[in-house]
Amino acid sequence: MAKMMKAAVVRQFGKPLVIEDVPVPVPGPGEILVKVMACGVCHTDLHAAEGDWPVKPSLPFIPGHEVAGVVAALGPGVTDFKPGDPVGVAWLHDACMRCEYCETGWETVCEHQHNTGYSCDGGFAEYVIAAAPFAARLPVGVDFAQVAPILCAGVTTYKALKETEARPGEWVAISGIGGLGHVAIQYARAMGLHVAAIDIAPDKLALARAAGAEIAVDARSADAVADILKATGGGAHGVLVTAVSPPAFSQALRVVRRKGTVSLVGLPPGEFPTPIFDVVLKRITVRGSIVGTRRDLDEAIAFAAEGKVRAEIKTAPLSDINTIFANLKAGKVEGRMVLEFAQAAKVRSEPGALAPA
């Protein structure tokens, strides 16, 4: 196996990523080395590269947390995988597994977690290290490029929909029909929910209808809230906000039903006003949701494996990463962008077929 690999490296916040040769990492105890076949590009990667959030990654680092690939090597003590197994590497690299959150199945809020492509190097590279207990098993025959977005956009929206506690036959409103929103619509429909989509762009509203939304509403319309209340018979039982827009957060509280739940995923800067009287009187629950647990990830992958969820993707080589970031900033990306490595994502996985030479 090669000793060096190509990677897109952040050396300065807010500056273009540098494509360079770096050493192939060596898996330690309990770790696996994954040969990256495809890696999705997420807004979180852009935030990481820009240094937007209060706790910043340590420079230099390699972003990327929607990794689909095959096991290339095993670290000491790993017995659950073998070379050539198709695996996914998601945002949650590992967690302590000892705190009250981990012990109750909430490793996503562990204060000692590490995150792929943020606090440890990610998948904008030919190889990446994964903690074996947190690597997701992918189905044999998987399309690597197609499954990559499920490892973040998929599990994030699936978990957030579960957090609304909406039941089959009830309504959810999904605000923001971009890379996350169009996937969320498909999960919602697969879960037996009716969907009202909210966005400000005509092309995104068209995407929402194509994905299965029963109604699609322009958020800027003076009648937007009234239209949703009427269509849903009094408001959505759950509202999922993926939009990176504070006004979308405020609008969500106006379209949710009494005793409904608003699940927040988007991470715009700043704050949003909360109508305390309405929240109290109508018993509205406002809940943040961050990615998903290992169980959530397995469930999200299962929906996709059954063909019930399929992200709209466009593929590009690693060398295009700075152009992709520029398009993300400008809001010019419809669906999800996925980096492919040496066209490897076009090869379907078979047992042993993709093991390293």
What annotation goes with each model-predicted range?
Residues 164, 168, 200-202, 206-285, ...:
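Glycine-rich cofactor phosphate-binding loops and adjacent beta1-alpha1 units
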Residues 2-5, 250-254, 294-357:
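C-terminal hydrophobic helical "lid"/dimerization subdomain
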Residues 56, 94-175:
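NAD(P)H dinucleotide-binding glycine-rich loop of Rossmann-like/cofactor-binding domains
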Residues 23-39, 52-100, 139-142:
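Glycine-rich beta-strand-centered segment in the early N-terminal region that forms part
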Residues 23-24, 58-64, 116-120, 126, ...:
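Short Gly/Pro-enriched turn/cap motifs at secondary-structure boundaries
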Residues 87, 140-222, 226-227, 240:
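Mid-domain Rossmann-like dinucleotide-binding core that forms the NAD(H)/NADP(H) cofactor-binding site
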Residues 44-50:
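Cytochrome P450 core scaffold surrounding the K-helix E-X-X-R motif
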